[in-house]
Curated annotation (Swiss-Prot):
Keyword Oxidoreductase included in the entry's annotation: yes
Protein origin, superkingdom: Bacteria
Binding site residues for pheophytin a: 126
Similarity-based family: Belongs to the reaction center PufL/M/PsbA/D family.
Binding annotation for chlorophyll a PD1: 198
Annotated site residues (Cleavage) in this chain: 344-345
Protein known as: Photosystem II protein D1 3
Binding-site positions, [CaMn4O5] cluster: 170, 189, 332-333, 342, 344
Gene Ontology MF terms: chlorophyll binding; electron transporter, transferring electrons within the cyclic electron transport pathway of photosynthesis activity; iron ion binding; oxidoreductase activity, acting on diphenols and related substances as donors, oxygen as acceptor; oxygen evolving activity
Cofactor note as given: The D1/D2 heterodimer binds P680, chlorophylls that are the primary electron donor of PSII, and subsequent electron acceptors. It shares a non-heme iron and each subunit binds pheophytin, quinone, additional chlorophylls, carotenoids and lipids. D1 provides most of the ligands for the Mn4-Ca-O5 cluster of the oxygen-evolving complex (OEC). There is also a Cl(-1) ion associated with D1 and D2, which is required for oxygen evolution. The PSII complex binds additional chlorophylls, carotenoids and specific lipids.
Function (record text): Photosystem II (PSII) is a light-driven water:plastoquinone oxidoreductase that uses light energy to abstract electrons from H(2)O, generating O(2) and a proton gradient subsequently used for ATP formation. It consists of a core antenna complex that captures photons, and an electron transfer chain that converts photonic excitation into a charge separation. The D1/D2 (PsbA/PsbD) reaction center heterodimer binds P680, the primary electron donor of PSII as well as several subsequent electron acceptors.
Membrane topology of this protein: Multi-pass membrane protein
InterPro entries: D1/D2 (IPR055266), Photo_II_D1/D2_sf (IPR036854), Photo_RC_L/M (IPR000484), Photo_RC_L/M_CS (IPR055265), PSII_D1 (IPR005867)
Length: 360
């Protein structure tokens, strides 16, 4: 009898836990994806703060030349970063227990892997949690689909690029200046600016910002007057009201006359789908661009494509960009490589064209 009561009690406890996890009445929806999201994001956040503030220098290139990234080692908020794990580690999984001691783990950049893996699991779970909550509320799943764009971008620069290049030392440093360095090196080695997927990503980000500003300003300019001049116009809206708060006909008429009629949406649903889809598709393509770079599918090469009648090169902007790429490539990791890969890959010129003949 006692055993039966204990089993029922444990079953009831589990059922109550399941109901709490999946309840949409909580102030903060947890969900089954949240059970994974909360510990992984907390772990990544705590480790990031500790590493950003106090981590010792990391031998990122694997040549015993450590790079200091933390605040306590002389950096400021702009220059500080969590330095990627060492090139000596490569793509090996490097948890704390694989190192001989904590000092070795820190020297080889172990915190970077810990942060990146937990962070990626956390944002994947957050995306799943968005879908889960939408499902339980009877909503469509497009919030999670939209969030997949930044998730894909983060995965590309933190994981896919490292895998393609063969080492986590090639991943994105977790800091402001480190991000800029990553962008410069990516451009130098892969000609990012000449890749069509990057161009689509730029169109998505800047176009999305433009369309968002246009939409917000049009709506704000065509609000239905509900207040006096001495009141805030925001007081004219009541949360949950059924009537429209702005005049879409007026906004459509204004924008149609400003440009031309068919440049303006006359369907609010189509308009908002467009506002969501444009930047999301653009960032998807930007993520695909980084995935291409990971496996050295680089931007277009139009170097020295114009020649005069004498066969001399007429420089284009592609040639000037290529010169900048070579300069950046020559300067980064200067103690690892003697020459940029593009310069070192040519045919070797023999020192002696012909061995001297010895006449006895």
């Amino acid at each position: 009898m006692t055993t039966l009561l204990q089993q029922q009690g444990s079953a009831n406890l589990w059922e109550r836990f399941c109901q709490w996890v999946t309840s949409t009445e909580n102030r903060f929806y947890v969900g089954w994806f949240g059970v994974l999201m909360i510990p992984t994001l907390l772990t990544a956040t705590i480790c990031f703060i500790l590493a950003f503030v106090a981590a010792p220098p990391v031998d990122i290139d694997g040549i015993r030349e450590p790079v200091a990234g933390s605040l306590l080692y002389g950096n400021n908020i702009i220059t500080a970063a969590v330095v990627p794990s060492s090139n000596a580690i490569g793509l090996h999984f490097y948890p704390i227990w694989d190192a001989a001691n904590l000092d070795e783990w820190l020297y080889n950049g172990g915190p970077y892997q810990l942060i990146v893996f937990h962070f990626l699991l956390g944002i994947f779970s957050y995306m799943g949690r968005e879908w889960e909550l939408s499902y339980r509320l009877g909503m469509r799943p497009w919030i999670a689909v939209a969030y997949s764009a930044p998730v894909a971008a983060a995965t590309a620069v933190l994981l896919v690029y490292s895998i393609g290049q063969g080492s986590f030392s090639d991943g994105l440093p977790l800091g402001i200046s480190g991000t800029f360095n990553f962008m410069f090196v990516l451009q130098a080695e892969h000609n990012v600016l000449m890749h069509p997927f990057h161009m689509l990503g730029v169109a998505g980000v800047f176009g999305g910002a433009l369309f968002s500003a246009m939409h917000g300003s049009l709506v704000t300019s065509s609000l239905i007057r509900e207040t006096t001049e001495t009141e805030s116009q925001n007081s004219g809206y009541r949360f949950g009201q059924e009537e429209e708060t702005y005049n879409i006909v007026a906004a459509h008429g204004y924008f149609g006359r400003l440009i031309f009629q068919y440049a303006s949406f006359n369907n609010s649903r189509a308009l908002h789908f467009f506002l969501a889809a444009w930047p999301v598709i653009g960032i998807w393509f930007a993520s695909l661009a980084v995935a291409c770079f990971a496996f050295n599918l680089n931007g277009f090469n139009f170097n020295q494509s114009l020649l005069d009648s004498q066969g001399r090169v007429i420089n284009t902007w592609a040639d000037i960009l290529n010169r900048a790429n070579l300069g950046i490539e020559a300067m980064h990791e200067r103690n690892v490589h003697n020459f940029p890969l593009d310069l070192a890959a040519g045919d070797q010129a023999p020192v002696a064209l012909q061995a001297p003949a010895i006449n006895g």
